[in-house]
Amino acid sequence: VHLQIICFNKNIDLSSPEELFSFAIKDKNVFLGVELCLAENTAEGLMNVQLTRGTMSSENFTQVIKMGVKNGITVECRLIDLLSCIRSPQYIAMPVISIKQPLGDFAESHEEKSAEQQEPLLEIKKTALIRKGTVLESYLSHADASGCLWLTGKAEQYYDMIEYNGSPMDVRIASDSHSLKLDNENGRLVCRLKLTVLAHSSLDIRDEKSSDQVAALVKQRLEENITGVWNKALYENRTDIFDVWRLFRHKYPQSYLKYADRLDEVLGSVELETDITCRVS
């Protein structure tokens, strides 16, 4: 049986992962794909939540994280992701798990809640930013996490609700193609995202005008989420969770070495250009 999840307190120091996870580096039987997360309050309190069917299990945690990533509300962080930062810049996003307590008792006029309804639930309200081993005070919202997944090409499909003709409309957005490149334009570093998505709405949209309207709304939502997380992570917190530094090192290795001690400053000046195409079906 493999170790499936490691949960930390928010005050954890992750600046020396080789020491913190020495047991994993030495033990070939430890699965490097183990999920990492932070507890909203304390890891001990989270792991000791009592259920009528027993104590909270690792399967509960991994399922919550996997579904969170699939639904575009958080960013996955595995042990191998952290270990890869041992000799590289450490910019990480990590799910924060909290306990959602059941609502208060019903009034006498209501039926009593079932045992399952009274169970505490695990939920992901936000995603932490970790920079050089420190968990920052700024967190990613669900929209930010979605933008990060689209920007890095890790989003497969995503369900969202957009306002269409004055009414809410459910939309399923699936990735069709993705590319992220870094260019030097007259001394300006520009990160170019080219993204094509397929959108399927809950309404039967057949005419071209309506299709174009929905496509424009989906494109606007994606641009807002992507630009929002770029500004929050890279500009406001100097935390490159998009691996732009890898693009910089690969394409401009000499400049990377030259500015290695000023990498945060360089990355904080990179501009983002988005080219998003949406096709509605």
Model-derived segments and spans:
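A glycine-rich, acidic short-motif signal
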Residues: V1-S281
